[in-house]
Amino acid sequence: VQYVKDVVTMVKELDGKMVSVVPATVGKIIPDGRPEEEWEWAVEGMKEIYAYSESVGILLGIEPINRFETYFINRGDQALALAKAVGPNCGVCLDSFHMNIEEDDMFEAIRRAKGRLVGFHVADNNRMAPGMGRLDWKKIVATLREIGYNEVLSVEFCSPLDRTPANPYPNSIEENPQGLSPEAKKFLEDHGSSAVTEDFYSMLTRKSVETLRPLI
């Protein structure tokens, strides 16, 4: 709880607007208690964070992530239920990569979030840059427009590791990254990725822009 409050403080100092919150430990897929206990813990912790974020004018967006990264909040309807239990201004932050895994209909999930959607993370179904997989970006953006979403599309690609001769992007992995902290290295590894070369990262960023800019 204190860590997220510290993040809220940092975002405020950087003149940011919103903090996305995964209300569980990423990578932990075994429950700690009974469902009703864990729900109570989550609501209690989020309410404390929410009270602080409200006091400094920062929005919270509860983000559901896929079942292989957490057992707790995986779908948009779960995130909405938690947001409503926390407070009237608590929002949700959806992620196209996770939605592709967990939602029966990702477009309906977006529609259900109308009025509570405060952030949207974009990556393709393979977690590469938008346009490098099979997600329908034209329909995704159109659905966001339909519900009146006019906030940021946060590009959050996390390219999968491929250390085999079949790697379609040779020389994409940075074998000797400079200035990468142990925490950043662990974050990348926890997400099935690694440090990538500057050229590869630039290509992913360029592809994201080429895919999304014509739609917005």
Q: Where are the regions that the model predicts?
A:
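Generic enzyme active-site microenvironment
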Residues: 61-62, 93-96, 154
